Amino acid sequence: DFYQNVLLPPREAFQGSILFYEVCGCPDGETYAARMKKMAEHGFFDGIAGLLLGKPLGGRRAAALYDRITLQVLAELGLSHIPVVSNATFGHNSPAGIIPIGAMAELDGDNGRFSILEAAVE
């Protein structure tokens, strides 16, 4: 099971963190919803400060679909309190932004903003 992979950090590492997830690898909304539910089952959303979703392939229609599914699944799981910013440009899309893992960041779900608050390198 991928979600129990020893290469992934322990779930405690996610406490207070912003979880970023690249949705471009999901072939359809049904698969995406199933993956989100599986991630929740394995504790990925426990105690996170926010969820940052990458821009899906398929343009605005795909983005609207994944937004709707995300909010629906979070509501079903009793996780509507988690702020979400979607359609972010990181990972395997264009333009490809880089997110420095471990850097202090801020996610504002109400205004759709994600900000990195400190230098990624010294």
Predicted regions located by residue number:
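Accessory alpha-helical/coil subdomains and C-terminal extensions
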Residues: 1-28
